[in-house]
């Protein structure tokens, strides 16, 4: 426990002075031919402004107020501040045929890139304008609980909003980012990132509509953000496609408010390396299918993580979303075998099934939850999940009226995806916790309605 407390203090100190500034000229995209009429594709003009700014050593590329700049793919570059003035909108072109660069390299099964960069430094995206991913334009039929996905084989044309690969010194501040068709803000191999004061407003019916994905990245701070997302709001991971960027560590999330149809704050499920030294503090989670989740499904490890001072509200949503209203969920199970469109990237090269790594030294402190289910901690074998601390964790169990009760969700795992626990037995237990092959220290207290 002392070790975890030291990790918390060190992480907070690490980020106190984080910040960058991009100085130089200000270039208005309209001076480079952008029309801003919301109908003409302005990508070429915006790219000309970015290229000119980069050639001159950096500065600000300005999207002026009261214009909508529809655009296809745009490449961001070093020493650029992309600044959106109030009432300016950067809107994704809805034409699927113009998105050709995969967000995951050779794996084309997980969407394309819209606003992107690779191996640059000193990038900032600021202002009180809006970046709009035009998400519904890329969806199929609207269903009761979600949007149907258009049929794909190996190629998924849905664009990710921001794919930022190998960025050293990154700021995203104050902007509104909305309507992602796939992942919204994807940090890959970034070092020194500060996401502060943004509104991230995704459609709650869009599957795979993650908010912020921190992938193989280090020294990241996410603070004072408001996030609504159909899929995970904030997710830490290590995807196999980007293994060259190394582990994910030294991450702070603080003062955020989140709503998700999946998991509000998640670690996993993709994790082929290590995720360590993570602090999530002072957050509020509302109306989510799962509150806090560690979902380890690959050979990587998750260690030294602190969740503290969190209020959360979980309720049962449709099974198209992973989760069964678990306020706290800590698991390590081998990934399911299957015929997913990117199945060749799910396991180590040349293998047809995978393993799952250790999850250890995870602390939950000062958590208050209202939920339609209890907490779940489990692993595929004894010793895989251990050192899980509960201190001052309180769960108010609310009996759901319409959905099936007393089921925990292990997806995507090999074998049965659901664990059935009798609801009457659950509420008769002195704690709101169900465990499987796991070692916990302390237990969540509970009341029931």
Task: Indicate residue ranges for each PLM-predicted region.
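Extracellular/periplasmic carbohydrate-active domains that bind, remodel
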Residues: 20-449
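Small/flexible residues
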Residues: 7-8, 223
């Amino acid at each position: 426990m002392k070790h975890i407390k030291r990790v918390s203090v060190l992480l907070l100190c690490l980020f106190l002075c984080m910040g960058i500034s991009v100085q130089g000229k200000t270039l208005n995209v309209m001076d480079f031919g952008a029309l801003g009429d919301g109908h003409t594709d302005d990508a070429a003009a915006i790219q000309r402004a970015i290229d000119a700014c980069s050639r001159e050593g950096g500065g600000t590329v300005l999207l002026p107020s009261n214009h909508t700049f529809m655009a296809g793919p745009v490449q961001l570059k070093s020493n650029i501040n992309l600044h959106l003035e109030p009432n300016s909108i950067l809107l994704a072109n809805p034409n699927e045929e113009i998105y050709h660069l995969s967000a995951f390299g050779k794996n084309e099964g997980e969407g394309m890139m819209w606003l992107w960069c690779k191996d640059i430094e000193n990038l900032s995206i600021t202002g009180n304008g809006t970046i709009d991913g035009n998400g519904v334009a890329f969806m199929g039929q609207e269903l009761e609980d979600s949007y149907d996905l258009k049929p794909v084989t190996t190629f998924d044309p849905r664009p990710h909003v921001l794919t930022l690969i190998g960025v050293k010194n990154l700021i995203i501040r104050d902007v509104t980012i909305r309507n992602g068709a796939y992942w919204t803000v994807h940090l890959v191999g970034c070092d020194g990132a500060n996401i502060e004061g943004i509104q991230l407003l995704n459609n709650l019916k869009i599957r795979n509509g993650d908010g912020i994905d921190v992938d193989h990245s280090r020294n990241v701070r996410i603070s004072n953000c408001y996030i609504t997302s159909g899929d995970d709001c904030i997710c830490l991971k290590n995807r196999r496609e980007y293994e060259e960027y190394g582990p994910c560590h030294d991450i702070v999330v603080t003062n955020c408010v989140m709503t998700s149809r999946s998991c509000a704050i998640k670690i996993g499920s993709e994790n082929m390396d290590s995720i360590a030294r993570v602090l999530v503090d002072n957050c509020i989670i509302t109306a989510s299918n799962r509150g806090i989740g560690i979902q380890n499904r690959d050979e990587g490890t998750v260690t030294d993580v602190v969740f503290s001072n969190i209020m959360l509200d979980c309720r049962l949503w449709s099974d198209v979303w992973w989760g069964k209203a678990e306020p706290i969920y800590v698991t390590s199970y081998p990934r399911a075998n299957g015929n997913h469109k990117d199945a060749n990237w799910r396991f180590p090269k040349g293998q047809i099934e995978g393993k799952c790594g250790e999850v250890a030294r995870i602390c939950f402190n000062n958590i208050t939850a209202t939920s339609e289910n209890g907490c779940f901690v489990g692993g595929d074998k004894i010793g895989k999940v251990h050192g899980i601390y509960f201190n001052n964790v309180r769960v108010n169990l609310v009996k759901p009226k319409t959905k099936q009760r007393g089921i925990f969700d292990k997806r995507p795992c090999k074998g049965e995806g659901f664990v059935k626990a009798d609801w009457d037995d659950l509420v008769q237990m002195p704690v709101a916790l169900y465990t499987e092959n796991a070692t916990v220290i302390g237990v969540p207290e509970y009341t029931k309605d």
